[in-house]
């Protein structure tokens, strides 16, 4: 472990020099790759440096206690310092083990969040809207930027489908566990008998793809320009600003009309399409390898039921880790930390178990 850590420190110092090299700075792709690598190593190096200081404290305290000639007060102080340092050493060793776990290369990326109303008609579409609000409030609490990319709104205010770009530090690492089927149990607003109905919305979390990672060739792209429409389908712009893009080999389609100009809609559309196409091909590769998608939490199947939101009992249950919280109202208002932290800890614990086998 320590040889690996010394190697990491050496690489971190090398990256610091490379990132100040004008030749590297002028190469955007390489600069971004090296910046990401440096950011990934930063916590490892800082924790290891702290660990070495603690080892030094232990060594110094033991040496002084072994020399003798100390008064009782000094001995007691050194013993307390030694005990505290040994406890800190154990904590840091566990932290280092976790930091050295194989890291998901997408953890530092922004995400495209896609939510679809699935089984349950209008009620499923309304629940998709509830989930969207939950993720938006959570993003705001983290200081992340939340931007609607594409929305297909139903007549009663829900969403058949909605996509959002969430930008900021550690977005993917915290929200990657949200992909899957989310089930709601509640009395719909349209229900006159007061019966509880079950509906489902699906969530897909995709790491945002950088331009240098994925470029769609023009021959594979069809672009349609049309007039943006508002509620009821009426045209709201005299100038055609809405953009529809289709990736011909896969049939993946995106439509963008949120912005006022055609160029801004184009930029957002190509960003969304790049991410969806990249994710499509990545999923095919992972399916071929028959590997779990992204983590050990759940099967990685996008149709897997991962969580139930029970309104009558104010209960949220995450089925993958057996976590039940009587805090539905709080969680739907964006206070998701307890759920997300539990998923991260579970994932890390499972990976450590695999490593120690």
Swiss-Prot record:
The keyword Protein biosynthesis applies. Peptide chain release factor 1 directs the termination of translation in response to the peptide chain termination codons UAG and UAA. Keywords: Cytoplasm, Methylation, Protein biosynthesis. GO terms for cellular component: cytoplasm. One of its GO terms (molecular function) is translation release factor activity, codon specific. Methylated by PrmC. Methylation increases the termination efficiency of RF1. This is Peptide chain release factor 1. PANTHER family: LD18447P (PTHR43804:SF7). The lineage of its organism: Bacteria, Bacillati, Bacillota, Bacilli, Lactobacillales. It is found in: Cytoplasm.
